[in-house]
Amino acid sequence: MDTFRKWLNKPKADDKSLLARFYHADRSLTAVASELDSFDGRAEPDRCTRLVSRLRQNQDKVLAITNLIMEELLGEERDPRAFRAKFPEEVLQENLAGQLWFGAECLAAGSSILNRESESKEMRPLAQAVTKSLSNVRVLLRDQCLRNNVPNSKTLHLDFNDSTTEQLYESLKIFDHLFAEFELSYVSAMVQVKSRHEYEMQQWIGVLFSETLQRALKIGLLDQDMVDAFDPGLMFSIPRLAIVAGLVIYAKGPLNMDMPGDELSEMFRPFRTILIKIRDLLRNLSKQELYQLEKLLCTNEEINTKVPLGYSSIEAPSPEPNSSNNHNNNNSNSSDSGSAKTSTTSPHKAVERLVDHRNNNNSSSCSASAATQAVARSPSMLSLSAGSTPTASPAPSPTPSHSIASTSSAATTSTNPPANWSEDDDDDDEEREDDEEECGMLDSDEQDLNDDSDSDVDEYIEAQLKAIVAAADCASGYLIPNTNLGNLLQPQTAPLTDNFVASEDDEFGAEQEQEQQQRQREEQLQPSSEQQEEPSTSAAMLAARRTLQRLRLPSSSSENEQTTGSNQQSTIKTPNGGGQPMRSGSQRQRHHSHHHHHRHHHHHHHHRQHHHQQQHQPAQAEQHSHHHHHQTHPHRTSRSARKRCSQEHWESTTAEQQQTIDHGHGLASADTSNASSFSDDVSLAMRNTTARLKFKSTENLLHRLFVCIAGVADQLQTNFASDLRQILRSVFLINMSSSQEDIDIPEKTKESELFEFRASENDVIQESAGSNQSIYSAEEVNPELDNVFNMGNGNGGGTNAARHSAGAAMQRNNTIDLSGGGYNNNNNNNNNSGSSSSSNSSTVARSHVARSRSLGDQEAATSGTLQEEQRQQQQQQQAQLQLQMQRQRNNSVGSNSPSSSSSSSSSSEHNSPISTRSGSRRRLHSNSASMPSIGSTATTAAATAAATATTTTSATTTTTTTTMSPPAWIPDGKAPRCMSCQTPFTAFRRRHHCRNCGGVFCGVCSNASAPLPKYGLTKAVRVCRECYVREVRSSRTQAHSQASRPQAASAS
């Protein structure tokens, strides 16, 4: 019985129904599997390889058709496959199902995945269940092919009351569940699949990218047009900006480096070490520097930082006459008394920031003493912080690092350069340097502290000052190039270069200048230096006090302004109490020179800074030269001698500072818990600033930050290309300015709607009313009523023109009544002048139809104009007829003019897009319709001449080939199914656009290719089957007509 059913109901090879396609694919798979089992694969490896390739192709085909059947039968009951979102993009291929089936059979047969033995052992039972379930499904589907197959049916026609159909339904559900489970297990074993947490972290990274893009658009780093145009440069700019924003702007987001490493996204986990160091540097940048860095990351332009690195970021108070000297502004004019205009960085402001809090909380005598000591040191502090310090922030900085740090560094004394220290001293000094110079992390809004809060921590501050000031002698400050942290920005896992920090050549050059300047200062030591140590120590203590208190207690800007105003007078008074506004320039310069006796670890540009000041301060030039140029000793001090001198001087300075602290303030006990937490805050803030102190200038810092950030972001393009593409695609779609207009899928209900109108030579306007290259658009023409589709009518060109005009009027919702006399006249003239006059009069009719439409359907004017111009056209056509008859006679004696004309016409019509569908059959038909009317008055030669005239006219009107714009593509989201076979698209069945109609089709329905010269596409491109049939058929018909026309003309 089964044999009979198989013989009777066997699907034919051309049957396109799902069951028939499955039947033939399954038979092909069975044949290949049988051939594989028939020989030893080890004996014939080449044949075995070919058969295995065919086997996998057939498995793909069988599973693809099975998937379509399950999609139709199960529908929403299919097992969900949301886990595919976690798969890499490279895994989701069309042949994934075949790979899974092949892997399941291998595992079921006892094989194991390479280096995945444990996972293979776990998956083996599941693989056996999958292969067994799939075999059962194949048997049931083959049975359904022989029972319920309907030839060429697009849907399944199963008998749901039959037990075999119910059994097939349940078997498909079981197979679908097992296959989905095996897919997840197998792919997870083969490639790394994200966990739930990692997938959520990737989504947070996408949110960070989107927020970064919106911020960049807001501040003007990027343009909305770049986002709308999907600028490829944004693929590099957005990840770079996201790193900066994630580390600084959104510090608690997915790039929070304080979270454990295993909680960080796997995209940035390999770069955690370098990201922490980048974050520490970014936190010390001002707003202007951060903007310059972000702009550099977007445009790759050169860094242009005109503001010096040590330029103050604190705004000076309102200018007052003779209040300060300007040591930073080169354009200032110095008077004889040394007074100058107040600039952004003034010694008055620097001193005020150091002692205003001290003046608020201590007695009047202590306040005056502190102010005096600070004023005595202010010029040196200013010169270090403003012009020569390579580690402070530029002017707009919200977190200035110049004043406190440079003050405490400038107020310390030392005798030897840091290159002479031992390794242990280097380590200790670096920690002390961190504690001292982290003061620059403080925000300018927190310059003053609350008076009530000061007493709580004052005693502990005094205890901490001793250690900080004692460490200042050996602290290298801003002045040491990077000597120990050679891999400051070098991650352990990211293959970036080592040249991110200062090189040894730069370090050696800095040490040479420091040693030369140190030799000069050592010879300048005077007994008065001991007297200056106490003010130096006091200034350092005050600076450190303000630093520690700012870290502990916040204050408002209003308090800062009040304190500034109340302490301004006490700050600028002299120790004599005489009420002089400030010391003269010579007095200040003496203090400046005394400071240089003790502070040798200053920047190597400091010497040049004094020369620069000398040019603008004539009153101070003599003393400045005296203190710096009277030394003529060229010898070099040995390292051991400098080391001993450094140690001895450090011990003596420590003892003096201890006595000064004990005498001036005294030490008291403080709260241990508060002290420890306070110390942690100080050390943390100071560690953050230490990294910035290693760079010579702002340009150097920004350049190396750019190299590090760009290196990390660009490695994401390589290591996590798939994830980054998905994130960027989502970001672009979210941040587009406006979504595209919805484009509905056109429903092809009528065969005529599949054709586009293309004007023939009869449709060309040849009068002055319009260009001779103009044609009617598709909106103005009804193809069903046009003579392009009217092949069998023999009423002449005038009737076709009338129909076409009427169709155009219907399209435009206008009513155009043309007088019958005009068209009767037209037909009579056609009968008297041949087919050439028929074509031309039809053109005239079209011309006037268009003109009447534009002028408001003026019937009478149209009829009168038609009759007039038809008379003129008749005379011209008669002259042309005589000329063509003469050319025909020349052709009979060997002239090649008509043949060349015919050949040019043929070539031009073949290449012209506007005559693709208006083949020569219609022109010959028009000629044959007009020929009987002139049979009694013309000879056969005249008829041939008329045909040649028509060909010449066609050649004239089609010489200029116009390229049409390609059709708009339907978006992928608007086409869930193939527009031809209605098969739904899946992750394995991808969409393809037809270049001719713009529709969306599957790979089967759009597997043809053909050139489209009408769109300027001379090479073969993808087109759907319908367009291929239509285009190829029309082109072949046209070519055949053009080839037969010269033969007919020569035969006649």
From Swiss-Prot:
InterPro entries: FYVE_LST2, LST-2, Znf_FYVE, Znf_FYVE-rel, Znf_FYVE_PHD, Znf_RING/FYVE/PHD
Residues reported in the UniProt entry to bind Zn(2+) 2: 994, 997, 1024, 1027
Taxonomic superkingdom: Eukaryota
Phosphoserine: residues bearing it: 555-556, 854
Protein's UniProt name: Lateral signaling target protein 2 homolog
Residue stretches of biased makeup (Low complexity): 312-346, 379-392, 400-419, 824-842, 872-915, 936-963
Function statement: Negative regulator of epidermal growth factor receptor (EGFR) signaling.
Zn-finger region bounds: FYVE-type: 972-1032
Positions with biased composition (Basic residues): 588-614, 625-644
A Pfam entry, by short name: FYVE
Biased segments, Polar residues type: 554-574, 652-661, 926-935
One GO cellular component term: early endosome membrane
Similarity comment text for this entry: Belongs to the lst-2 family.
Region listing for Disordered, in residue ranges: 311-348, 379-455, 506-539, 551-678, 814-973
Alphabetic keyword roster: Metal-binding, Phosphoprotein, Zinc, Zinc-finger
Biased composition (Acidic residues): 422-455
Molecular-function GO terms, alphabetical: zinc ion binding
Protein residues bound to Zn(2+) 1: 978, 981, 1002, 1005
